[in-house]
């Protein structure tokens, strides 16, 4: 019967977009949530930059996070610059681009801060500086911060956001994993508090070292928390991973983190932990 005959249809991939009309749409007008896929006007994002539907936290620069997290802050070790021990091709250009994007000299902001009135040593990794990668001087800044906190008997709060060890620095980058963890162990041995907040993404050598050492470990909603990348794992085991396998919610179920906290609640939560963690005077 003609009623049931196949009809000719035009597939979506054969429909040509009106390039002229596309050019009339201002750049940055719309945002798309990488977690739930919601498309919305960029003006709906406030200072926290979270998806209005699923609370996924869009990536922030260290200074953007610092602006709403702390009422006071003082940057330490800001003059430390990345090294280029291997003279890696185009590395200097990547460093220059990272500095321009973030206003930092390295992939982590370090300093003294007050969060909800509680004084703490603070480190915030910046995913816009060579993907927040852990380089030789990133590790140096973190180590110096933790050692200073131990000497001054301060707690330490670290926000992680990293693609892992910085490949352009080879073994010098990998050595920072042990170096920072050793500083953390000395800090803990002194009876001081070490808090970690995992943000999107926390992967590779950072996950395998100081991101996993928190006395209390928090994570932002839907943050990617992993060691190896999805494609690497799937090509190794020849199986597809579940969609949420490397998300904070799955990691929480398996006991790796203690709590998922919404970005709007981070300041209050950290202030409470710092106050009642036994490391602060009233």
From Swiss-Prot:
It comes from the Bacteria. Its cofactor is Zn(2+). It is an enzyme of class 2 (transferase). Its main location: cytoplasm. Belongs to the AccD/PCCB family. It is found in: Cytoplasm. Pfam families: Carboxyl_trans (PF01039). SUPFAM superfamilies: ClpP/crotonase. It comes from Lactobacillus delbrueckii subsp. bulgaricus (strain ATCC 11842 / DSM 20081 / BCRC 10696 / JCM 1002 / NBRC 13953 / NCIMB 11778 / NCTC 12712 / WDCM 00102 / Lb 14). Keywords: ATP-binding, Cytoplasm, Fatty acid biosynthesis, Fatty acid metabolism, Lipid biosynthesis, Lipid metabolism, Metal-binding, Nucleotide-binding, Transferase, Zinc, Zinc-finger. Acetyl-CoA carboxylase is a heterohexamer composed of biotin carboxyl carrier protein (AccB), biotin carboxylase (AccC) and two subunits each of ACCase subunit alpha (AccA) and ACCase subunit beta (AccD). The keyword Lipid metabolism applies. Zn(2+) binds at residues 33, 36, 51, 54. This is Acetyl-coenzyme A carboxylase carboxyl transferase subunit beta.
């Amino acid at each position: 019967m003609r009623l049931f005959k196949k009809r000719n249809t035009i597939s979506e991939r054969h429909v040509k977009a009106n390039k002229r009309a596309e050019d009339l749409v201002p750049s940055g007008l719309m945002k798309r949530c990488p977690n739930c896929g919601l498309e919305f006007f960029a003006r709906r994002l406030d200072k926290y930059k979270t998806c209005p539907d699923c609370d996924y936290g869009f990536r922030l620069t260290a200074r953007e996070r610092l602006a709403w997290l702390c009422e006071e802050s003082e940057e330490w070790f800001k003059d430390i610059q990345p090294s280029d021990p291997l003279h890696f091709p185009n590395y200097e250009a990547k460093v220059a681009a990272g500095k321009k994007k973030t206003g930092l000299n390295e992939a982590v902001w370090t300093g003294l801060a007050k969060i909800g009135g509680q004084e703490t040593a603070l480190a915030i990794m910046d995913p816009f500086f060579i993907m927040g990668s852990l380089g030789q001087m990133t590790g140096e800044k973190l180590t110096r911060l933790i050692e200073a906190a131990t000497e001054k008997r301060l707690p330490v709060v670290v926000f992680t956001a990293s693609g892992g060890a910085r490949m352009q620095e080879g073994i010098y980058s990998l050595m920072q994993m042990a170096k920072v963890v050793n500083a953390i162990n000395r800090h803990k041995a002194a009876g001081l508090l070490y808090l970690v907040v995992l943000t999107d993404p926390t992967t590779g050598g950072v996950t395998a070292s100081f991101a996993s050492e928190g006395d209390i470990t928090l994570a932002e909603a839907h943050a990617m928390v992993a060691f190896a990348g999805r494609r690497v794992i799937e090509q190794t085991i020849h199986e597809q991973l579940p969609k949420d396998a490397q998300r904070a919610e799955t990691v929480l179920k398996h006991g790796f983190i203690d709590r998922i906290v919404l970005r709007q609640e981070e300041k209050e939560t950290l202030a409470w932990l710092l106050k009642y963690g036994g490391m602060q005077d009233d």
